[in-house]
Amino acid sequence: MGDLPGGGGGAAGGAGAAGGGGGGGNGAAGSSSSGGGASGSGGGGPGSSGLPTTNGLGVAGTAGPNVDRPPSPARLSHTSEKHPKVTLTELNMLRRHRELCDVVLNVGGRKIFAHRVILSACSSYFCAMFTGELEESRQTEVTIRDIDENAMELLIDFCYTAHIIVEESNVQTLLPAACLLQLVEIQDICCEFLKRQLDPTNCLGIRAFADTHSCRELLRIADKFTQHNFQEVMESEEFLLLPVSQLVDIICSDELNVRSEEQVFNAVMSWLKYNVAERRQHLAQVLQHVRLPLLSPKFLVGTVGSDLLVRSDEACRDLVDEAKNYLLLPQERPLMQGPRTRPRKPTRRGEVLFAVGGWCSGDAIASVERFDPQTNDWKMVAPMSKRRCGVGVAVLNDLLYAVGGHDGQSYLNSIERYDPQTNQWSCDVAPTTSCRTSVGVAVLDGFLYAVGGQDGVQCLNHVERYDPKDNKWGKVAPMTTRRLGVAVAVLGGYLYAIGGSDGQCPLNTVERYDPRQNKWVAVNPMSTRRKHLGCAVFNNYIYAVGGRDDCMELSSAERYNPLTNTWSPIVAMTSRRSGVGLAVVNGQLYAVGGFDGSAYLKTIEVYDPETNQWRLCGCMNYRRLGGGVGVMRAPQTENYMWCDNNSSNNNNNNYNLKHQQQQPQQQQQQQQQQTQQQL
């Protein structure tokens, strides 16, 4: 399997059988389990069973000395899958019939009968209440305030049935109740439901709700949604009703998705004029977060500077003067840099991640699934025509390429290409000159490179590249080292080959290819030997995570700084992952699948460079080892962001995001002349 890590083994054991006979006189007893026998003289007397005594010597009716013997290897272990469900069902029936209940919860005007042990096992809140020194621990009736009685009944039902239905009519009472009772699973379900309901008319309300109940992940998603869809959000009634603090939180974001800063100013003025009498006192506080120096001179003078509310406020006039100075004095701009002069950089929208092929349940697979980080959903797309483990995956010209791999029986040189617009794979791509599995694939200067791998006979150092215009592969300079399970990355116009195995042992060496000189040159090695690692470029660093060294699968990670030619460690992932995929989607770094030394993984985790932490953030539909990952823009023909195909509210929630383009920057001389004319 291309030296992909794998695991599994079996053990078999046997048990001997013993038999004995007994009777009067000189009856004999024998046993045979491994070629041995025993006979006894003076057999069993009347009433003797003829069975071996507890000394295990196989002599009927004979009392022997106490001898420690290992237990018989013949045994049957059983774990019931039905038992938990049956037990819960019976406990719920007892509750319904008010049998053996030892506590009554008074919630609102309703009495809810229950068993303390069940509530304590499910809820940390109840566990603290009933097992501590609180007065409620000795009461048979407990009053619980500040919670909706219908929500409480649903949550108690969940404790007994493991089933709950979250819907629009109950989510706003269920989530606070689940927070109070510390039912984390229900909190997560409620937040997931609300994420799927996000649209421009309700995202601000959901954001405030998440903030109130400390649902950090929902708050983050609602913030991202608001930023991505600000042009629609600013037209909603919720936006006009925002308190000033929340308005400031939104417009100060670098990731606000607007065509120009004019939209931000217009949004602020719409909010202000919705209630001028109460809000005009906040104008300067809000306007300082509008990046006035980035406005066009015409708009700054003709619209902002001439607005009566702006002109009547001294602090606002100062902000306008600051912007004029910035536009009039380009030579002084380096000294005038600050939050208001920093261009907004909205996250690239509509990126989705594809997980392609891999190894699952003892065989190579052809399945492909797509991950949308904004909805945290994995959805199956069209499978490849061949099963491929150890496949190389890259995106070229908005098409996803799957290169080589192993189909479970043979090594492949065939290639398939996926078009997200049609959700179809085509096989009309020219094959590589060599069969390759555990191959590294990347795109550089419009060419698709296939690096290293193995062909079933040997580990390869061959490198070839594909020209999509001619549909041909051509060889380039080989690497200095043979590498299978190699990771590749493109940074600064170079192609890096990182780690892998030379067929004998894992490598920590790194080399990079210069296409201008058609030459590979070694750079500083990693601190750890790694094969079947994950690799991606993130914030101008090359990240290398997981893989396997000489002994075990790895969770450790490190990153390469090309400016200093050094590797430095970062925090380890939450799981060991060999055969892991690594990719950057919408400005976040994701580690996908792999093998932890005992099981194939379908979990994914995301890295936060600010906190230097990884966190689990979902699961694929399939466990995948040695699959490839690729990132693409979602197709424009599909309602791809913030929608759930299974949602009953599809018609309300599905809409296309419009791709916005930054206006091209004027040449400095032209801009200066125009600025002087207009100011």
Curated annotation (Swiss-Prot):
InterPro entries: BACK (IPR011705), BTB-kelch_protein (IPR017096), BTB/POZ_dom (IPR000210), Gal_Oxase/kelch_b-propeller (IPR011043), Kelch-typ_b-propeller (IPR015915), Kelch_1 (IPR006652), SKP1/BTB/POZ_sf (IPR011333). The gene is dbo. Residues 203-305 form the BACK domain. Residues 1-84, 643-679 are annotated as: Disordered. Residues 101-168 form the BTB domain. This is Kelch-like protein diablo. CDD domains: BACK_KLHL20 (cd18459), BTB_POZ_KLHL20_KLEIP (cd18249). SMART domains: BACK, BTB, Kelch. Keywords: Actin-binding, Kelch repeat, Repeat, Ubl conjugation pathway. Kelch repeats lie at residues 352-398, 400-446, 447-493, 495-540, 542-587, 588-634. Residues 645-679 have a biased composition (Low complexity). SUPFAM superfamilies: Galactose oxidase, central domain, Kelch motif, POZ domain. GO terms for biological process: negative regulation of synaptic assembly at neuromuscular junction; protein ubiquitination.
